[in-house]
């Protein structure tokens, strides 16, 4: 009872209401004062107006909120969340994370898997696992520092063509589009400088920037070894 687990795929009964689903979970845990516990769970996650609504009629964001209420109903000390906001809209994601931060402030510990780097940045500590191996762990600042990446941000026309050229050069470990700019990175500063110096001219504008968590994530993905290819 010390651990709660929330699956990525919604795993509750869609032909039951929110209230009925939570009551079912409370029965499984044999919780005393079941009705009061369910009412508090509904109130705590802001589900009062929808408590009679069938789970199958809920949007992705409301389903995740109901699932969180169910996972918290037995008051665990550790909650495992597997891709908790996959497939939900940006507002629902933000609201969900506000709930997470509020619960964490009360002392609840979360272990979360995510592919969203903006969500990873919300966590106190990170661990990057690839093919069953932990490549790096630490705070956001520690993970970024560990990669030792040098990153340039490039603005200008034909960035796709520029990226293809740069990827062929020594020292350029990645050239990846970020919205309307190109991030060019490498861990060997001199080799990177030698390769990109010829391109630091019109029509492109080059700016040295701090490497972000997403730059590091892409770098780690590229260097990770697929254990099925050994």
Tell where the protein language model's regions lie, with residue ranges.
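Conserved ABC ATPase "signature" region
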Residues: 23, 27-50
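Conserved ABC ATPase signature
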Residues: 54-58
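Hydrophobic anchor residue at the start of the ABC signature
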Residues: 68
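Conserved catalytic motifs of ABC-family nucleotide-binding domains
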Residues: 75
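Catalytic Walker B motif of ABC-type/P-loop ATPase nucleotide-binding domains
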Residues: 79-82
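ABC transporter nucleotide-binding domain
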Residues: 98-187
């Amino acid at each position: 009872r010390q651990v709660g687990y929330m699956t990525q795929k919604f795993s509750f009964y869609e032909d039951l209401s929110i209230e009925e689903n939570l009551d079912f979970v409370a029965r499984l845990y044999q919780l005393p004062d079941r009705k009061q516990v369910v009412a508090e769970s509904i109130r705590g996650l802001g589900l009062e107006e929808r408590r009679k609504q069938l789970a199958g009629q809920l949007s992705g964001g409301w389903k995740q909120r109901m699932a969180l209420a169910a996972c918290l109903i037995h008051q665990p000390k550790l909650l495992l969340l597997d891709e908790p906001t996959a497939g939900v809209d940006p507002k629902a994601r933000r609201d969900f994370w506000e709930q997470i931060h509020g619960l964490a402030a009360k002392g609840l510990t979360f272990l979360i898997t995510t592919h969203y780097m903006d969500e990873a940045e919300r966590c106190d500590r990170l661990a990057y696992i690839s093919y069953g191996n932990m490549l790096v762990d630490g705070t956001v600042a520690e993970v970024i520092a560990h990669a030792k990446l040098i990153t340039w941000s490039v603005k200008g026309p034909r960035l796709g063509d520029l990226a293809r050229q740069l990827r062929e050069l020594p020292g350029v470990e990645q050239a990846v589009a970020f919205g309307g700019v190109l991030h060019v990175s490498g861990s060997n500063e001199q080799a990177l400088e030698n390769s990109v110096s010829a391109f630091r001219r019109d029509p492109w504008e080059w700016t040295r920037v701090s490497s972000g968590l997403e730059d590091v994530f892409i770098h780690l993905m590229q260097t990770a070894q697929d254990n099925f290819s050994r």
